[in-house]
């Protein structure tokens, strides 16, 4: 069998895939001895997604040889949503062109998902000269984006010494969420210079859907530069987004 991997906690894995599927229709997943990885760009080429799941976060990880499989993300998401929080998730692939998805809990349920041909693009996650790094709770970021969506389709992030602000302005109203290091929601802040950049709320809303309230989210950005948003999966895995800025006129 080319590979068999086991992940304890099916819902957590499902949330990861659901988040990515909000932005991309299909993806090529690479299974290697080191772990599972996926890198893709949304159809509008505004968001780059980078998923890295090392073999250490799986309770069982057996990959005979490196293999890349193409998956329809919407179908994958719908199947994974059938898993429960305490279910064990098993992903298997034999010689046939199917991914076998099994949930083991109160019963053993197995789905077979046909694999598809996906063009593999050579996408690089660039190293950019960010001037601000913000670490905050997922709940704070999600609520800030929801607040901003009431007044605008864009949100501005502003970082300066000891203060991080999320701000949105509409034609008649505005909202501002200000955090300092004294607030529980802001965990860390590193600023080389006062930094401002705006981003589309539609994309951000999709990017944060899978983030838990207590998750730590890392934001890196520069003046009118892309936003790099990252959160960890069981301390060693990582889901990273790179979102193009909304350049103001």
Swiss-Prot record:
PROSITE patterns: PCNA_1. GO terms for biological process: leading strand elongation; regulation of DNA replication. The gene is pcn1. Homotrimer. The subunits circularize to form a toroid; DNA passes through its center. Replication factor C (RFC) is required to load the toroid on the DNA. Interacts with TIP. GO terms for molecular function: DNA binding; DNA polymerase processivity factor activity; identical protein binding. It comes from Thermococcus kodakarensis (strain ATCC BAA-918 / JCM 12380 / KOD1) (Pyrococcus kodakaraensis (strain KOD1)). Inhibited by interaction with the PCNA inhibitor TIP. The keyword DNA-binding applies. Sliding clamp subunit that acts as a moving platform for DNA processing. Responsible for tethering the catalytic subunit of DNA polymerase and other proteins to DNA during high-speed replication. Keywords: DNA replication, DNA-binding. It comes from the Archaea. Belongs to the PCNA family. This is DNA polymerase sliding clamp 1. The keyword DNA-binding applies.
């Amino acid at each position: 069998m080319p590979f068999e991997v086991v992940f304890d906690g099916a819902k957590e894995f499902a949330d990861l895939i659901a988040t990515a599927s909000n932005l991309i229709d299909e993806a090529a997943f690479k299974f290697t001895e080191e772990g599972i990885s996926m890198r893709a760009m949304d159809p509008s080429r505004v968001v780059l997604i980078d998923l890295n799941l090392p073999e250490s976060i799986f309770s069982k990880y057996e990959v005979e040889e490196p293999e890349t499989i193409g998956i329809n993300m919407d179908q994958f998401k719908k199947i994974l949503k059938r898993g429960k929080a305490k279910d064990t998730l098993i992903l298997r692939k034999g010689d046939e062109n199917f991914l076998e998805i099994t949930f083991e809990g109160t019963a053993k349920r197995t789905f077979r998902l046909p694999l598809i041909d996906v063009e593999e693009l050579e996408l690089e996650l660039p190293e950019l000269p960010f001037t601000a790094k913000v670490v905050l709770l997922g709940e704070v970021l999600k609520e800030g984006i929801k607040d901003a969506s009431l007044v605008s389709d864009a949100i501005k992030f502003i970082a300066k010494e000891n203060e991080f602000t999320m701000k949105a302005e509409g034609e008649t109203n505005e909202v501002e969420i200000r955090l300092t290091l004294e607030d529980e929601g802001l965990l860390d802040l590193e600023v080389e210079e006062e930094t401002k950049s705006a981003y589309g709320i539609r994309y951000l809303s999709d990017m944060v859907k899978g983030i838990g309230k207590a998750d730590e989210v890392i934001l890196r950005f520069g003046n009118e530069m892309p936003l790099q948003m990252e959160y960890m999966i069981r301390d060693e895995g990582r889901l990273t987004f790179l979102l193009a800025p909304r350049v103001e006129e």
